[in-house]
């Protein structure tokens, strides 16, 4: 046996050193400090002292087992148990038990037998049935017995059953080992029963403890059971080893309540939904809906919020916020550093504006020495044309905008992308509505104006009248002390055209127009269309940089690579500098007129930015529709009847024309008839347009386009009619007629005759009969009537009889006498008037 110090023994037995020294002294082992060692002889003496403190008690128990019938079997069980006496306590605070110390010493020596218990169990079994009964009996005894004493046990204390059987002699017989294991099993069963009863029935435990003390037995308690050392293995009667027996545990959920709320920093982007905002603040979506409701906003968890509303919600709930910069990618891609480049003078961009048929395109045609007007339907410019003209004093880029009312937005775009505006006013017509509008656009864009008084060659031309009318609209000529140059021109004879160009170039010198000729190109989309065999085609005005074939470009929500470029004469070019209009091919789709064009080096970034812009447009459209729902509800409140809707599918040749027609048609909507353009696009009418028209009962309108063969066949089958136009006035007039057809006819009353009562007769069959003279119009038998007394209507009904002398009459004309019987009315008096009227339908007009 290895030597051990007093300190090590005290540490392994979980006892204080002073208490252990006193206990060793009581056993006759003198030690003075914790560094003193214990010899094997002293350890053996210590064990003998512990064993001598134990007593052996014998107990016999006889039980009776019933068999079938009247037979009984007596079962006698003898138990021997060693019970250790309590050692005298040296200190009141220290609990010293021989069993504890014995277990501790066993852990040190590991080969000394501390506890020797032998239970002689004699069982008398006469037959196999008695053995089975005994097994059932022992199983019932092993179960804990809980009486209904008003207490509820949620869990038993965890009891570790450990092995306390050790071998003292290597030659111990196998039968003795088996007996020890069975004895350990019995001790555990009784201990569990005692522990359960101790917890459930406190009073019964005390009474049983007294009885057990009288017979020399000591009752086990939970504290003693918890102090058993080693692993006690449980075996059944046949020696089969069982698993470790443990009392069930009760799982407890540990939760620490937060002391204060967590303040989060929420990143808010435009169009954030309620559910996304709730997730970032770690709250339920219903809480945010509740906050919105308190703010007077009805919302769902999937509804998008603007940034201002989201900020209010975050601050209301006690969190911080940061705004997400959604334009970071756009700023990084579209902003071009041109600090290393030098500016050069560029050609002026001139827009020709004015009223319809005042000669804008004719003037430009004379300047370009071409016949552009011949190619326009009806002599009216349908979309913007961009042309570059070279003169002796420099180049000028012209933009020709439509003049009639439908193309307001196109004129506004032309004014934004131009340097100088040539305002064409016909000398024989004066200032017209589109002339005033052109002046407003030019002033809003802060663009200088040069007035061209056209058609000066006509005899009825009056330029002084034009000057006077423009002066009233704050366009003051230089001759009157203003800053606007007036030039009399004739697009037919060419008179004054050279002076006009000189005035434009002079104005451009004053403006000192400059641009960067190098670097990535920037510009604006003047016009766009979809051409068969070429795909999307965009007319672009380059404003800065150098646009080259093969560049990656981004136009609004469309992107692509420049596959080909053509100038205003239709010739292919490889590069285009500032103030140069070009047609480009290669875009992914048709961009909107007015979109900015920018060259991006990385095609992947261009695609990503285009997708981001498209998503923004969709979100903005959804938000706008959501905001209009409530206003539409209030606008429709109190209106009688259902609003008729004229659905239209519009296809055009160019983007600008489609946009202008769309705006003009939407303006035709009234409270009774609404124009709904369910689809619009560029290019020929296809079979998908026909299918959509059938599904939505819409009218298909083509402006300068036609239907393809597949669409025509499908239209014949489904009965869809196409309407083709090349003049916008005709299109608008036909749509007005179609809207008038949807209007419900108006019912109007028309008085057709008046009869004056001269005398009243009594009839047994008809009651009161009025003898009348028809003084106006004609009285008809089948028409409704009104009875007037002193020009006040006192009755309205129908005629029951109308007679001329004794014969029935269907009508009586003016100047003839007749007898009139009013149905369900007998209070007819002399001097009354009987008014006959009819209800007619009158078609409504817009």
Curated annotation (Swiss-Prot):
- Binding, GTP: 354-361, 400-404, 454-457
Q: Where in the cell is it found?
A: Cytoplasm
Region called G3, residue ranges = 400-403
- Write out the GO cellular component annotations: cytosol
Q: Does the keyword Transcription apply?
A: no
Chief subcellular location: cytoplasm
Spell out the residue ranges making up region: G1: 354-361
* Signal peptide per UniProt: none
Extract the ranges annotated as region (G2): 379-383
Region G5: start-end pairs? 490-492
- Please provide, alphabetically and separated by semicolons, the GO molecular function terms listed in this UniProt record: GTP binding; GTPase activity; translation initiation factor activity
Annotated region (G4) at 454-457
Domain tr-type G, by residue range, is 345-512
Give a short account of what the protein does.
One of the essential components for the initiation of protein synthesis. Protects formylmethionyl-tRNA from spontaneous hydrolysis and promotes its binding to the 30S ribosomal subunits. Also involved in the hydrolysis of GTP during the formation of the 70S ribosomal complex.
> What PANTHER family does the database record attribute to this sequence?
TR-TYPE G DOMAIN-CONTAINING PROTEIN (PTHR43381:SF5), TRANSLATION INITIATION FACTOR IF-2-RELATED (PTHR43381)
Q: What is this protein called?
A: Translation initiation factor IF-2
Species annotation = Francisella tularensis subsp. holarctica (strain FTNF002-00 / FTA)
């Amino acid at each position: 046996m290895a030597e051990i110090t007093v300190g090590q023994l005290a540490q392994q037995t979980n006892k204080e050193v002073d208490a252990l020294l006193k206990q060793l002294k009581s056993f006759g082992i003198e030690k003075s400090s914790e560094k003193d060692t214990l010899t094997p002889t002293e350890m053996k003496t210590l064990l003998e002292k512990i064993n001598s403190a134990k007593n052996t008690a014998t107990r016999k128990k006889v039980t009776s087992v019933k068999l079938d019938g009247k037979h009984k079997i007596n079962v006698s069980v003898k138990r021997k148990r060693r019970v250790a006496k309590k050692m005298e306590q040296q200190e009141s605070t220290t609990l010293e038990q021989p069993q504890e110390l014995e277990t501790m010493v066993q852990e040190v020596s590991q080969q000394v037998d501390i506890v020797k218990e032998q239970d002689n169990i004699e069982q008398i079994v006469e037959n196999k049935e008695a053995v089975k009964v005994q097994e059932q009996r022992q199983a019932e005894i092993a179960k804990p017995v809980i009486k209904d004493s008003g207490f509820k046990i949620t869990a038993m204390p965890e009891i570790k059953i450990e092995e306390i059987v050790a071998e003292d002699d290597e030659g111990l017989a196998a039968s003795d080992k088996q007996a020890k294991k069975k004895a350990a099993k019995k001790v555990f069963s009784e201990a569990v029963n005692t522990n359960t009863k101790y917890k459930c029935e406190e009073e019964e435990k005390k009474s049983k403890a007294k009885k057990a003390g009288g017979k020399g037995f000591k009752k086990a308690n939970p504290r003693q059971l918890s102090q058993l050392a080693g692993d006690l293995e449980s075996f059944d009667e046949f020696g089969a080893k069982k698993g470790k027996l443990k009392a069930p545990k009760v799982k407890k959920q540990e939760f620490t309540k937060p002391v204060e709320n967590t303040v989060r920093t929420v990143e808010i982007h435009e169009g954030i939904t309620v559910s996304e905002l709730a997730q970032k603040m770690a709250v339920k979506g219903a809480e945010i809906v509740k906050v919105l409701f308190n703010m007077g906003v009805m919302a769902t968890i999937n509804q998008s919020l603007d940034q201002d509303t989201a900020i209010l919600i975050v601050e209301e709930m006690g969190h911080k916020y940061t705004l997400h910069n959604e334009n970071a990618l756009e700023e990084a891609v579209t902003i071009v550093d041109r600090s290393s480049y030098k500016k050069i003078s560029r050609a002026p961009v001139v827009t020709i504006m004015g009223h319809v048929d005042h000669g804008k395109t004719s003037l430009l045609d004379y300047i370009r020495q071409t016949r552009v007007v011949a190619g326009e339907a009806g002599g009216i410019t349908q979309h913007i044309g961009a042309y570059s003209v070279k003169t002796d004093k420099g180049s000028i880029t012209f933009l020709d905008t439509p003049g009639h009312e439908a193309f307001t937005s196109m004129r506004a775009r032309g004014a934004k992308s131009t340097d100088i505006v040539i305002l064409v006013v016909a000398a024989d017509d004066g200032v017209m509505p589109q002339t005033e509008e052109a002046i407003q656009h030019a002033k809003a864009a802060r663009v200088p104006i040069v007035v061209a008084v056209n058609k000066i060659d006509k005899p009825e031309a009056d330029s002084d009248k034009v000057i006077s009318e423009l002066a009233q609209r704050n366009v003051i000529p230089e001759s009157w002390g203003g800053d606007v140059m007036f030039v009399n021109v004739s697009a037919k004879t060419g008179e004054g055209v050279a002076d006009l160009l000189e005035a434009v170039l002079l104005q451009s010198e004053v403006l000192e127009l400059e641009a960067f000729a190098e670097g990535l190109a920037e510009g604006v989309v003047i016009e766009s269309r979809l051409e068969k065999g070429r795909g999307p085609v965009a007319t672009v005005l380059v404003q800065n940089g150098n646009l080259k074939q093969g560049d990656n470009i981004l136009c609004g929500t469309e992107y692509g690579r420049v596959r080909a470029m053509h100038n205003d004469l239709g010739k292919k070019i490889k590069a285009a500098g500032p103030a140069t209009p070009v047609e480009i091919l290669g875009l992914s789709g048709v961009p909107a007129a007015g979109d900015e064009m920018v060259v991006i080096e990385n095609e992947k970034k261009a695609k990503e930015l285009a997708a981001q812009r498209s998503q923004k447009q969709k979100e903005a459209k959804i938000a706008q529709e959501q905001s209009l729902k409530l206003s539409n509800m209030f606008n429709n409140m109190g209106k009688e009847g259902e609003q008729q809707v004229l659905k239209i599918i519009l296809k055009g040749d160019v983007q600008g024309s489609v946009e202008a027609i769309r705006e003009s048609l939407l303006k035709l909507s009234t409270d009774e008839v609404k124009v709904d353009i369910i689809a619009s696009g560029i290019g020929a009418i296809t079979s998908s347009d026909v299918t959509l028209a059938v599904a939505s009962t819409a009218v298909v309108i083509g402006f300068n386009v036609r239907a393809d063969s597949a669409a025509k066949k499908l239209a014949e089958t489904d009965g869809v009619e196409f309407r083709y136009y090349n003049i916008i006035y005709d299109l608008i007039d036909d749509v007005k007629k179609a809207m008038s057809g949807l209007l419900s006819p108006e019912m109007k009353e028309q008085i057709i005759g008046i009869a004056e009562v001269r005398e009243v007769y009594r009839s047994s069959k008809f009651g009161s009969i009025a003898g009348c003279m028809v003084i106006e119009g004609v009285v008809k038998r089948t028409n409704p009537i009104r009875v007037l007394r002193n020009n006040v209507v006192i009755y309205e009904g129908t005629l029951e009889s109308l007679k001329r002398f004794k014969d029935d009459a269907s009508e009586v004309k003016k100047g003839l006498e007749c007898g009139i019987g009013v149905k369900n009315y007998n209070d007819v008096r002399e001097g009354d008037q009987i008014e006959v009227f009819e209800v007619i339908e009158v078609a409504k007009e817009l």
